Amino acid sequence: MRKNPFSDTLSFLTTGGWTTVVFWLLLLASVGIAFLNFRRDPRQRSALHVWNWLSRLFIGALWWQQSLWKLPPTYTDQPDGSGGLRYWIGQMIQGAAFHVQADFVKKIVLPHFYFFAPQVYAGEVLLAMSLMLGLFTRVGGFLGALMAVNLWLGLYRLNSEWPWTYFFLIVIQIMFVAYRPGRSLGLDALVGHEESMPVSRAGRSG
């Protein structure tokens, strides 16, 4: 049960096994990459770039946290394989906005759960890494938007869900596709550093 955002964040950062260690490595790597960009490129030293970095960092952390209740080998949060991803996939049968999605989940996805579950888990982990490290963020944003659309439509009719939550996530991920937040204190900025360097006068005159 959640208590408050501060104690819950502290618990998230200090409890758990290997997943907490990996998250800390991603977090420290993100900070280190941001510092390197900030030091190398004066154009990165702006409030806008810092905000873009924090935005993708937090959304990346969201996807990482969401992957924790669908860990292999069961891809659920119970040793017997119940709950977790299997439960929420089942909820889409009842909550999907359109019958075609509900039928697909019922007839294709659930009967082949262990084919689709690793793809969902891997997708969320890769998405979290992409956004936290600022690497291939357009691809990460596009993948995140698709996953959010699936959640928005798949759980739309459930009274326990607020559809706007997923819709806002779609909007944010599309903004990542459009504005390439990895160019703000991320690995995308380091990789594209030479390309983005200003053209010299000699180069312009030539």
Task: Name what the model sees in each region.
Residues 1-97, 103-123, 133-206:
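Extended, low-polarity transmembrane helix blocks
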Residues 126-130:
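Transmembrane-helix motifs of polytopic, lipid-linked glycan transferases
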